Amino acid sequence: MVKMGTVWDRTVDVMNGRAAMLASIAALTLWLPGVVRQALALAFVGNGTATPAASGGALGLYFLLSLVVAVLAIFGQLALIAVASDPATTRGEACRTAAARLPVAIGLALLFALAVFVLLVPPIVPIAAAMPHPVGMTPQSMGVAMAGIGAGARAFTGLYMLVFVVVMIWLAARLALLNPVIVNERDGVGSFARSFRLSRGLTWKIIGLTILLGIVSAVVILATQSVVGIIFRLILGADNLGLVALLTAAVVAVATSALTVVWMSFVAQLYVARREASDAG
């Protein structure tokens, strides 16, 4: 029987013993790319209106950079899990493992995204059919579309989306160990089934912990953004709002990166504990 308290204690031990290695990986793969993307976004968008430079190839560059940042984030998460799974793993070994398993992780993520898209088709069809303009979805057109469909279709859409959210929460819990499985077991599509088996009996615990961590993360991020933003604005003045936004984003990125390290370390140790219990049983 896996106890979450024991797993959390192991997680704390991992973060205390391997803090420097975890921090260096997070800084290079999570924090720095995110800050660079934010700087580029501020260069393209001033006070909410796209600048002339953003109308051409610059937006394509930003989109490409966003893809690179997303890939680096996946790479960083895999490397963090590799470090947190085995105390003998070095930084170089963790990075090599992450690089080797990155295509699998991206492929499974795309496969999951495709499945989610397919599940979203039924409620989208009646809304799209009632859209006044086939191209360009806006809040106003969405409102017109929802008013234009029948009561039965609205009820179906609302009920479907409610069930969809519940299913997504359940799936998120059952797939919480997917990345640790990808890193440690060298499997492909079978990683989905393996994650389901390892998370059996832990679903509600994982959901509860995820909700708790989500609340804590939201509070930390909002508090950091508000307090740091005010401090930087007082120091730099109202004439440097772009720099204030960039520095605030950099500090907030530190908080989000730290929270990611905590979660990756936890799921890695949860995987280790569950695998040990499974092997013993």
Can you say where each PLM-predicted feature lies in the sequence?
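Hydrophobic alpha-helical membrane segments
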Residues: 1-281
